[in-house]
Amino acid sequence: MRNLRFPNPRLLAVIFTVLALTLPAQSNAQDHDPDRLVIGISQFPSTLHPSFDSMLAKEYVNAMARRKITVYDHDWKVTCLLCTGLPDLSEGSARFEKTPDGKDGMALDYELDPRAVWGDGTPITTKDVLFTWDVGRHPETGTDSSELYRRILSIDVHDDHRFTLHMDRRSCDYKGLAEFNLLPAHLESGVFEPAADYRKRTLYDRDPANPGLWYGPYRVTQVNPGASIVLEPNPLWWGKKPYFKQIVVRTIENTAALVANLLAGDIDMIDGATGLSIDQALSFEKRHGGDYQVIYKPGLIYEHLDVALKNPILSDVRVRRALLRGIDRQAISEKLFAGKQPLAHGQTNPLDSVYYDDAPKYTYDPERPRKCWTKPAGPWAPAAYAAARTARRCNSI
């Protein structure tokens, strides 16, 4: 086992659930509007353009005001949000083909949801698909997902909603199109040229409250740079009606001030991914857990230790196994993270779709390797140095 890894729990949310009557007698708490949600985060988006500057704060806001063409659902299966069906080899909507230069490629058929419209009433069509592709593949725009757009060799448009992507390669994840971030051609095409200046001219920065930029259950109605973003229900949203009549995402960069605002009732919730670290959340829960609900959700990011395989002491796999059995990782998690940090038994997170549950697990069992070291040598025995000298005695650890 090469890596000793710990999943990095991303605290998704510290949610305010206490009624105003249980809070200290403060005007903000007493006057709380149940139709308004104020969320505290610790960073302000550098842009709201979906294809520039990948950052959590931007994704947090855009998730309320936009929808991707496809996403992974809770069962790690690709599903449509803005399309009517996924391309499939068995159904003929995905096909193997040769690229113009004779390499293996694929053709993928998609159809946009005919109900989908931008927030100003303009239908979302294949014109937006073509414009988005032009922006994404242009060498001077510098979009985040330029590799995806370059993989698309051409696009066949069949009508306002149906189109076919011709890809330069074949892949097992061909159904997904999550990084193809649709842009409103009727608004952004007018500011695209010259492409090198598009990042400075986009309406997502110059006029972010323009309803035609958004097509989610909410739309951005006000931006106070560096301070807050206000979202309100999109009256043209074709899906389930959103619950809150207004959501305010407020930026408070100092985490101590963020917590103080929550305690004062000035904000209702702290987003974990862009708010508090896990140790700060644990400290908050210890002091105020009776009045607030803290939700912990592990993320897919792993913090881990890589073993230096060139080190002669660690070059033998049996030594590494022995070391793993000698580390009480559960105790470490309990001491440092109150048990909120799940243990990793390999390089793949259990939440991942490709996780294999039957892979070997090296649980804490210091006696097991110690039985092999009947003749420890040196002052480090029976630790790693002695193990390296006597590992041959162990046929199986």
Where are these regions (language model features)?
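N-terminal lobe/hinge region of extracytoplasmic solute-binding protein
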Residues: 40-100, 213-215
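Surface-exposed binding/hinge segments that line
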Residues: 10, 28-31, 146-197
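Structural transition elements
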Residues: 343-382
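Short, well-ordered beta-strand elements
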Residues: 33-43, 84, 105-111, 129-132, ...
